[in-house]
Amino acid sequence: MLPNFAVLPPEVNSARVFAGAGSAPMLAAAAAWDDLASELHCAAMSFGSVTSGLVVGWWQGSASAAMVDAAASYIGWLSTSAAHAEGAAGLARAAVSVFEEALAATVHPAMVAANRAQVASLVASNLFGQNAPAIAALESLYECMWAQDVAAMAGYYVGASAVATQLASWLQRLQSIPGAASLDARLPSSAEAPMGVVRAVNSAIAANAAAAQTVGLVMGGSGTPIPSARYVELANALYMSGSVPGVIAQALFTPQGLYPVVVIKNLTFDSSVAQGAVILESAIRQQIAAGNNVTVFGYSQSATISSLVMANLAASADPPSPDELSFTLIGNPNNPNGGVATRFPGISFPSLGVTATGATPHNLYPTKIYTIEYDGVADFPRYPLNFVSTLNAIAGTYYVHSNYFILTPEQIDAAVPLTNTVGPTMTQYYIIRTENLPLLEPLRSVPIVGNPLANLVQPNLKVIVNLGYGDPAYGYSTSPPNVATPFGLFPEVSPVVIADALVAGTQQGIGDFAYDVSHLELPLPADGSTMPSTAPGSGTPVPPLSIDSLIDDLQVANRNLANTISKVAATSYATVLPTADIANAALTIVPSYNIHLFLEGIQQALKGDPMGLVNAVGYPLAADVALFTAAGGLQLLIIISAGRTIANDISAIVP
């Protein structure tokens, strides 16, 4: 069963932790294992004492020596089994410690209930919004409780999983004891054994061989902590099965929080990635320890998690081999040449909980990275001073980044392989071309004339957008895909090439516009046949009014109105926090980043490179264009989301 605590409110998580049996069963299990270990130690000592007494006493000769040799294996078996039992007791106590830590970190259910009761009381009396500040404070505290419970449960899940990976069944423990091998050597050979035993042994061998399978760990993107069965099926069919035939795909929980994009009060990106990396690494090691190979699927945030885990595993004392582990990543923010985290290396926004991590390692494990052209997360312009290109990428985060699972197998098979890598690499890079610019999608939504107008300007606009990537013919950087490439100032493109592309674009745009206009499909006028009948006596008869029903309706309307006002107020003030955090980042981190870039340019100039002075001025400007455009886009998404929520709340009370 997948853990789903990240999407559960504190009422559920707190109740689960405090209402359970607690640590008593594990303490009892630890005591039982200790008793078993003590009995096994006593049995080993007693058996050893008896056999040694016989040898030292009156039993001498070759038979005595043979007995001592045979008994030694049993004594070793008993002693080693006792040690295993002691280890199991220690692990049970470790599980108790993990649970007690989680219990201490979990909010008590009484505190959660008190918070909800206070909110309900304030909402009931909030007819004119006078309780909005108090409700906001309580809601903020409630969200802190939510985050605290999720963090506690995530820590418990990771700790308990780590303990579970060290546990083995008692039968496995017995089979791993060295003395057991010598005992097995005394069993009859297959020629001497009954045919039924031989068949059973052969079946066991075949089963063990079949157990060496490839397990696919499928993670969701931001806002999808638990991938659905359909999500896992598509990830396998579209991306995984082509490179790893026969993979057994299964969902893997990771928190996937992204404040304030997913939910305004939610886990930050950095916290979510850190927890997800621990969970993924534990799951990989657990599968490899079970004798399975592993292939990992990561999308968006989980591609960042995969990138971190690659480096962590490769640097560990016991790294998996490339034959045991592989990765498939889509919409990767850490794409070496195009990922938004790689375009702005090292930048961090503490108020938003977002830090740009390094590029995905390209020569540690077999990896495939798929990127849709103009995806602003995985295919950010190399030259963001081109405002049109940057704005198109921001639109791409909304219109393109979510399209990876609606592609057809034919589109993925037609992806362009980027083969101009540098040096040895285990990673294959693919670009999936996009027909239309995301920037023009709002225009295309205009009825009748939207598509013709968009097709009129798109060819020339695409030339301008593509210049932000370095080549007017491509909406992605054509430099080596496995080299971490930060943003730059100006592309090295001949003006003649640009002029030729614009001339060709003008001709294409006029031709496309003329074709669209000549094939317009105008809506048909209504014939009136669907108009409702207004004839006398038609329709459902209206029930007679009564005083009781009228009062009941007024009470319901009053309650609905109060609840709606409260919800609208809560949504409105909830947008203030992310707005303040975005402003905080814009007023503190962005200027600091500009100074850092300026000093880098000055340092470059002092070392004799005259371009350093240009970079000292140009790099901060380019960064500002990208970062302030992204901040504006993020704020717009927050406002749109809040507006939709408010509209839905209001429409609920309007008949």
Curated annotation (Swiss-Prot):
Regions that span the bilayer: none
Residue stretches making up the PE-PPE domain: 245-469
BP terms from Gene Ontology: response to host immune response
Gene3D superfamilies linked: alpha/beta hydrolase (3.40.50.1820), PPE superfamily (1.20.1260.20)
Classification via InterPro entries: AB_hydrolase_fold (IPR029058), PE-PPE_C (IPR013228), PPE_dom (IPR000030), PPE_sf (IPR038332)
Pfam families hit by this protein: PE-PPE (PF08237), PPE (PF00823)
Family, as annotated: Belongs to the mycobacterial PPE family.
Protein name: Uncharacterized PPE family protein PPE28
Designated gene of the protein: PPE28
